[in-house]
Each structure stands twice: as structure tokens, then as C-alpha cells.
Regions:
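Catalytic cores of the polymerase beta-like nucleotidyltransferase superfamily
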Residues: 1-489
Length: 489
């Protein structure tokens, strides 16, 4: 038996100590051991033991047990959310999987080896005892980590027929770790791909989301397509393979979508942007027409077709209605910034209304992904920087009398008659506030208004015009500052 010295948090070792003190074995197992051996920080910590669920619960003050697999959630006193709940599971033997989703029955075992041989991949079938440093590796997982390969424990066909989601999980882990899928395991995926139809869309969605949020989603989806399982995740993507585009693009629609997605991942952008990037041109195959006049392919209206298709795809994947609405909106309007003749400040204000203030920057980021996905080298050419400046300009709060903590109706209540003098007073007040923002209080402005109300029309108009000119000057300076920020004139 090998040994190793791996760094394990005290909260986790304390749970193992409690199990051993109670007379039971306790090993870390699965992804946390794999990650420790690789040098990654584990996101989850799993303990396996020969104690039964009721024995585990008897050892710890606060637990919950709400599943058919024996897994007990142990609530710790740690403030760190990573260790707040640690799962402790008895060694187990699983019976037949008649539905390719879950075992027909689960039996608990007293033997660690029984538990390790039921696991999915060799790199996840290594157990580690923190106290002694013992490393139990019966299936060559440590060697596969060195080789950077993903291989099933035992026969691939049997493992995938037990739980077909393991095929998608292999692709996901390959993207997270940048490991290759071993040849026999790959062949097993090809042979068993159709079994994915039996998996609930919620479970498929969860694995897909983890793929999309990994550092290498483009690589993962390429592998999924080559192994024949992409069609059981988002079949519409396969329709984009080999669909040539116009001369502005270097790649077919499929590769363009994957490259757009990868840029979103490289930028560590949100799931919404990643899904929008993956699906933004999904309508192109259906909208493609040859133009004799242009001697090129056209895709008029593909954003409308794509938005409809994306809505259906996202519903099928059980994506939340709120997130789906955001993604569909981004896809529907993603062509807005592609036509410089249409992009006026008023048009930008309208598009902000269409996609929402909270999502306009996401639309710009999607445009960046779209551009990078064409194979063009520049991420932010002058035109895109100009659009960003226009968005900032359209969204900023204008310098105006609306900034004041007093309005025309209040001035009338103070005794001034409705008419042009109201505007002069407001602009005179604005100039003072622009000089000293501390004066923008209701108390000060009411007091100052009473003074201004005593002035003759000519003097008050002069002060008002000065304030108005000052507002226009400051407003223009603010706009120029925004343009300077984005390096546009």
C-alpha cells in the first residue's frame, strides 16, 4: 500500500478522527483525493466508511440523511462554506442498473475494495486515510493521473450502462483537468451513446453547465460531438457542422459557435453569456440563402430564427425561465452592433430598452465573442470601442436640474408663480451645486430659492442662463471623458 502526505483541512480530518474513535474506518475518496494528487484545491470533500448511516448519525451532533444511497450530510461548525456540510457515505455494493440511471438496489459493505470498484473512473477510485497517509489505489488511478487520461474502472460498457451520464461526465472532467479520454473508454462512449436518452434533462443540464463553466468548453463539446453524445445534449448544434458562412468568417457555423463560447470562457464571463455565445447563430443553418448578387451566403433574420430556437433548446434543458429570457433577448438583438449605419445614440437608447439596463454590457460582450469567433484577431476594434462609449453615454445620468433636491412644484409652493422664472431659478441653483455638491440639500436649496425669488427678471435670467451654459459645458465634458475612456473621438 502506498502512502502520501496530502494537505487536508482540520475540519475534515476531525470528522475522520471521530469515525475512527467510534471504531470505524474513514477514508477520503473520489474527486477530492484526485484533486489533492493533481495539486488542485478540492471543491467538495467526501468521506467513505464501513459505518452504516445510523451509526454515522449517532457519532455527530447535527446530520441529515435523505437519500437511498446511505449518504449522510454532517453539518460542521466551520464558517467556511466548503466545509459546512461534509458527506459521509458507507462502503457500498450496487446491484443491476436496469434503467441506465440508478442502481436497482444498494447494499452496504464492510470492505473498502467493494466501494472503489463500483466507481466511475480510475482517477476517482483512490482512497486516502489522513491519519496514516495510506493511499489505496486498486485500479491504477494514480498512474492515470500521471498519464493525464480518463479511464473507466473495469469495462467501459458496463460502467456506462450503469449510469449513462458518466459519458458526459468523462467529457466534463476532461475539460476541467485537460485530460484525454483513454481509447477503450472513448470506444465505450461511442457504443453506448444512445443510452443518454434515458437520462433526465435536469441531470444532463447540470453536467452541461459544468462543461460550459469549465476552462475548456470548446474542447469538451468537440470531443462530445466526435464521440456521438452531443446529439443527445443539444442536437441543433450538429446541424451547424459544415455550414459555410460568408467571406467575413473563417469557420463554419459550428466552429464559430464553439470559438465564440471559448472566448467567453477565457474572459470568465457568466453562464448567460456563455450560453448566448454558444447559441447566438443557431438559426443560421435554417436562414442561409445564396445571393447571386453578392456571390456569397446571406443569413437574413437568423437572429430572430435563432432566438426562437434557443428558447426551445433552453426550455428542453430546464434552464430557468429568467435566465432563458435573458439569453433569448441577447440572441435576438446580437446583430444590433454589426451595422454601423444603424447605431445612433437614439438607437442605442432603444436597444437598452429592449435588452434592459442590466444586460446591455452583456450584449456588447456577446458581440466581442461573436467577433473573436470569426477568426479576426482584434477583440476591440475602433467601432466596438465607439459602441461601448455610446452605451455609457446613453446610460449615464445627464447633468440637469433633475439632479437637484428641489423641483418646480416646490418652488411654486414657496410662492413663485409658474412661468420662465422657475427655470431660471433651477438653473441658477444647479450652477451652485455643480460648484459645491454639499449644497444639494432640500434645506439649503429652499433657503437659496427664497433669495433668488427676490431678484428682478433681468438679474435672475442672467443667473439662469449662466447656469444653463454651465450645465451644457459640464455635460459635454462628461461625454468627452467617456469617449476618451474608450479611446474614441
Amino acid at each position: 500500500m502506498e502512502s502520501a502526505k496530502l494537505t487536508v483541512p482540520h475540519t475534515v480530518t476531525a470528522l475522520c478522527d471521530a469515525l475512527r474513535t467510534g471504531g470505524f474506518e474513514a477514508y477520503l475518496v473520489g474527486g477530492c483525493v484526485r484533486d489533492l494528487l493533481i495539486g488542485r484545491e478540492p471543491k467538495d470533500w467526501d468521506i467513505t466508511t464501513n459505518a452504516k448511516p445510523e451509526q454515522i448519525q449517532a457519532l455527530f451532533k447535527e446530520t441529515f440523511y435523505e437519500n437511498d444511497f446511505g449518504t449522510v450530510g454532517v453539518v460542521t461548525e466551520s464558517d467556511d462554506p466548503r466545509f459546512k456540510v461534509v458527506e459521509v457515505t458507507p462502503y457500498r455494493i450496487e446491484g443491476k442498473y436496469s434503467d441506465a440511471r440508478r442502481p436497482d438496489e444498494v447494499k452496504f459493505s464492510d470492505n473498502l475494495d467493494d466501494d472503489l470498484k463500483r466507481r466511475d473512473f480510475t482517477i476517482n477510485a483512490i482512497a486516502y486515510e489522513p491519519e496514516s497517509g495510506a493511499l489505496v489505489d486498486r485500479h491504477g488511478g494514480k498512474e492515470d493521473i500521471k498519464r493525464r487520461v480518463i479511464a473507466t474502472v473495469g469495462n467501459p460498457g458496463e460502467r456506462f450502462n450503469e449510469d449513462a451520464l458518466r459519458m458526459l461526465r468523462a467529457v466534463r472532467i476532461s475539460a476541467e483537468l485537460d485530460f484525454a479520454i483513454e481509447a477503450e473508454t472513448s470506444a465505450g462512449i461511442v457504443a453506448s451513446a444512445k443510452q443518454l436518452e434515458k437520462i433526465s434533462r435536469e441531470r444532463v443540464r447540470d453536467e452541461l453547465v459544468r462543461i460550459l463553466m469549465s476552462p475548456r468548453p470548446m474542447q469538451a463539446l468537440y470531443v462530445a460531438q466526435k464521440l456521438g453524445i452531443l446529439r443527445y445534449v443539444i442536437p441543433e448544434l450538429e446541424d451547424a457542422i459544415g455550414v459555410d458562412q460568408n467571406q467575413a468568417h473563417s469557420y463554419d457555423v459550428f466552429e464559430h459557435l464553439l470559438r465564440s463560447l471559448q472566448h467567453a470562457a477565457d474572459k470568465d464571463w457568466s453562464l448567460e453569456i456563455r450560453l448566448a455565445a454558444l447559441l447566438h447563430d443557431i438559426g443560421k443553418p435554417a436562414a442561409r440563402h445564396w445571393s447571386d448578387e453578392k456571390k456569397d451566403w446571406t443569413f437574413h433574420g437568423h437572429e430572430v430564427v435563432g432566438a426562437r430556437m434557443a428558447k426551445k433548446i433552453l426550455h428542453d434543458l430546464r434552464i430557468s425561465s429568467e435566465m432563458s429570457a435573458t439569453i433569448v433577448s441577447l440572441i435576438r438583438w446580437h446583430m444590433f452592433f454589426s451595422d454601423p449605419d444603424e447605431v445612433t445614440l437614439s438607437a442605442v437608447r432603444r436597444i437598452i430598452t429592449n435588452v434592459g439596463v442590466d444586460h446591455i454590457k452583456e450584449l456588447l460582450n456577446l458581440r466581442i465573442c461573436d467577433r473573436i469567433g470569426t477568426g479576426r484577431p482584434k477583440e476591440q476594434p475602433f467601432r466596438l470601442r465607439k459602441y461601448m462609449s455610446m452605451v455609457d453615454e446613453a446610460m449615464r445620468d445627464p447633468i440637469s436640474v433633475a439632479m437637484l433636491k428641489i423641483g418646480g412644484s416646490q418652488i411654486i409652493r414657496l410662492g413663485e408663480e409658474a412661468g420662465p422664472r422657475i427655470g431660471w431659478i433651477l438653473h441658477a441653483l444647479l450652477e451652485e451645486v455643480l460648484d459645491d455638491s454639499k449644497k444639494n440639500t432640500e434645506e439649503y436649496l429652499e433657503s437659496r430659492t427664497r433669495d433668488l425669488m427676490k431678484l428682478e427678471n433681468e438679474k435672475l435670467q442672467t443667473l439662469g442662463e449662466q447656469g444653463k451654459n454651465r450645465r451644457e459645458k459640464e455635460d459635454e465634458e462628461a461625454v468627452q471623458e467617456l469617449r476618451k475612456k474608450h479611446h474614441v473621438s
